[in-house]
Amino acid sequence: AEKIKICLQKQVNSSFSLHNGFGGNLYATEEKRMFELVKPKAGASVLNQSTWIGFGDSRTDKSNPNFPRSADVSVKTANKFRSLTGGSLMLSMFGPPGKVDYLYQGCGKHKVFYEGVNWSPHAAIDCYRKNWTDIKLNFQKNIYELASQSHCMSLVNALDKTIPLQATAGVAGNCNNSFLKNPALYTQEVTPPEKCGKENLAFFTLPTQFGTYECKLHLVASCYFIYDSKEVYNKRGCDNYFQVIYDSSGKVVGGLDNRVSPYTGNTGDTPTMQCDMLQLKPGRYSVRSSPRFLLMPERSYCFDMKEKGLVTAVQSIWGKDRKSDYAVDQACLSTPGCMLIQKQKPYTGEADDHHGDQEMRELLSGLDYEARCISQSGWVNETSPFTEEYLLPPKFGRCPLAAKEESIPKIPDGLLIPTSGTDTTVTKPKSRIFGIDDLIIGLLFVAIVEAGIGGYLLGSRKESGGGVTKESAEKGFEKIGNDIQILRSSTNIAIEKLNDRITHDEQAIRDLTLEIENARSEALLGELGIIRALLVGNISIGLQESLWELASEITNRAGDLAVEISPGCWIIDNNICDQSCQNFIFKFNETAPVPTIPPLDTKIDLQSDPFYWGSSLGLAITTPISLAALVISGIAICRTK
């Protein structure tokens, strides 16, 4: 009789690298970084498609006859905007004659503003002020600030008011022989005309609600005339100019009083109108002005102030041959938490010179999607926690941290072989091992608990000579995940507080934030090293367990035909058990040799591999099996006589 020894043989050669883990080691033909570095995409995006709203003009207006060629956004995104061709928030606030007057209102946790160009130097609006840019800057800044603290906002286009009987609506030749809707100009008709008339006393009320919109705070334009000297105003002997707003307690909240404040001292015969932006609570207010003229607030924007939210402002400029201003840009840059989207090239439209710019379409294409992170540097929707460069604030969501590629730990991949147990098998994963993305995508401080690494390793596996059990390793992963969740919450709260404080001239806070993020990145990289070691050990143990199951199945199939002389080795009488018999024992004839273990079902190919040492005779088994987060893909047999 000829007896042969058949063993499951270690099949590692120089193409394999060794990976050490907690509780077990692995040989692998390949390795990969746990995460790749991601690069943010330039432009705007949102964290949640259901909780954002946009405010725009013709470039986001679906009702424009040239849509979609006239638009800088997709049809999907246009549906999210409150827009009208020719409109702007400021035009609706002041209502200059001959301009579009649109009722802007809506609700959203994230507000995207792409408007403003329709009130720019090209519009040539006068009405006692040839250059409105500084007022526009102040207006936009207040809009962004209040919008970031509110869920809903609405134009209030008709305030309740009481006007003195002696005042009647006035007009101005430099305002298309009309005047703004807000403020309204009232004048006194005095007989004889050389007399001054009486002081004006008027009242207006800011409501607590406008339609369905709650109003906790109003943005009001407090407008008044600026005279260069008393003589310019006092041609009729009417003393000093004043226009002052008082709250219900008699406190001054806005306006100008040349009875106590000096005139400009410039030379000129025509006054200029100035409008300051006031944030006022609902209530009744009074306006007192010197004889002859009264500028009366008639409109406001109301905000519910119910929750902090996100604000994105998009640069709004004309194409060639039209003069633009950059008030939107400056307003956003000076408002904490405002994200600004800017073009790098001149505006070049498709429908005409001013509508349908390709660069702007690309910058706004991200509004069609949900991002994991939005920032001044761009948006990210990949799951990696690392990026090559520091993302500039403000930033919101689960934002990646800056890291060097070589600092990211590597995990084994390709064909995997444990270094102990019943010796060997190999696996070729068809999907990502474990849910690492879900486990550590928080991008925050992580730390080792007082118990150290041992706090995660709760058990041992006696039959494999030590190490951790699969169950204890899973508990370890759960503990790491819980620790990370806790740290994620506390750290993100701290970062949000810093976001609230950051403005573009607060370099010290920027530096502090950068230091904190660097510390977060280093801590996360350290924790990933721990997870990598646990992962290697867990896979190694799982592979060893699968080998025990495989060896047990072979022994059971062999019955009395083969004698197991050591784990993974059998003696067979070649005269009693010929080749077909051996094929039955070791090749399984396409049947499943290992019980399935949920949850991962993977189609695998178990076969010999030219990388391996040992006999050229190999087992070929093709069967669907499931082994937690791993799959077997090859073993070989060593024959000895």
Swiss-Prot record:
EC number of this enzyme: 3.1.1.53
Subunit structure: Homotrimer of disulfide-linked HEF1-HEF2.
Localisation per UniProt entry: Virion membrane; Host cell membrane
InterPro entries reported for this sequence: Capsid_hemagglutn, Hemagglutn-estrase_core, Hemagglutn-estrase_hemagglutn, Hemagglutn_stalk_influenz-C
Sugar-modified residues: 13, 48, 131, 381
The organism of origin for this protein: Influenza C virus (strain C/Mississippi/1980)
Record protein name field: Hemagglutinin-esterase-fusion glycoprotein
Gene3D superfamilies: 2.20.70.20, 3.90.20.10
UniProt keyword RNA-binding present: no
Keyword Membrane: yes
